[in-house]
Every structure is written in structure tokens, then in C-alpha cells.
């Protein structure tokens, strides 16, 4: 499983997920590919993640669904999105969020064009 944690996700979640699933590739956008994607628009990040077969982890329900809808209208796929709610997973709950991400990743095999909300 390959994950990209977007800028809204605490960077420490990457290491916490890797402790649970050491065979996965988990990157934070601030350091992924030398940090070049840190300030990139969501549509470009979705393109790059799709090319890399990397699922995006985000709490950004304000703009990301719009980009996904636009991609779909253009016939473009995405590699999947794991959404989470900050009320359920506050920034200080890194371990709890990491466990939920790992659990969702183990339960689901096909991520293409899907999104899952962590509970």
C-alpha cells in the first residue's frame, strides 16, 4: 500500500503508520519527492498520486471532492482517498489516526476511484 498524507495531516502520522505496517510506503506531502508537492494544487497532487498508485489521506472535504468530481467529468481516474474528520481524529491523536489508516488499508484492496471515510 502506498499513501500520501496531505498537508492537513500531522507529519508524525507517517512514522506511526509505518510502525504498524512496515511494508507500506507512507509519505507526507512536505517531504514526498523532495517536498516539491507541498504547495501544489490538489488536482496536480491527485495526478501525481494516480501515476504513483498512491492513496491520498486528507481531512480536506471542502475542496478535494470538487477536484475528484472534475477529474471524473474529464474521464480521469484517481488512486483513492482516505478522508478523516478532525473531531474524531484531532491533531494530537496521531496513534489513533494511524491505527484507523492502517486498518482501512488492510481491509480494502481496490482503491481506484474510491474514497473511504475513517470512523
Q: What feature does the model see in each segment?
A:
Residues 43-58:
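Short, structured active-site "lid" loops
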Residues 2-23, 27-37, 43-46, 65-119:
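Acidic, PIN/NYN-like endoribonuclease modules and their adjacent C-terminal/linker elements
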Residues 4-6, 55-61:
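Acidic beta-strand-to-loop metal/phosphate-binding motif
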Amino acid at each position: 500500500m502506498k499513501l500520501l498524507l496531505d498537508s492537513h495531516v500531522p507529519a508524525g502520522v507517517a512514522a506511526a503508520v509505518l510502525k504498524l505496517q512496515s511494508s507500506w510506503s507512507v509519505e507526507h506531502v512536505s517531504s514526498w519527492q523532495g517536498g516539491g508537492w507541498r504547495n501544489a494544487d490538489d488536482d496536480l497532487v491527485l495526478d501525481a498520486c494516480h501515476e504513483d498508485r498512491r492513496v491520498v489521506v486528507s481531512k480536506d472535504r471542502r475542496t478535494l471532492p470538487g477536484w475528484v468530481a472534475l477529474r471524473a467529468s474529464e474521464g480521469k481516474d484517481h488512486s483513492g482517498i482516505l478522508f478523516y474528520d478532525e473531531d474524531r481524529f484531532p491533531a494530537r491523536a496521531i496513534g489513533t489516526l494511524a491505527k484507523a489508516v492502517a486498518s482501512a488499508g488492510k481491509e480494502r484492496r481496490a482503491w481506484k476511484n474510491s474514497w473511504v471515510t475513517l470512523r
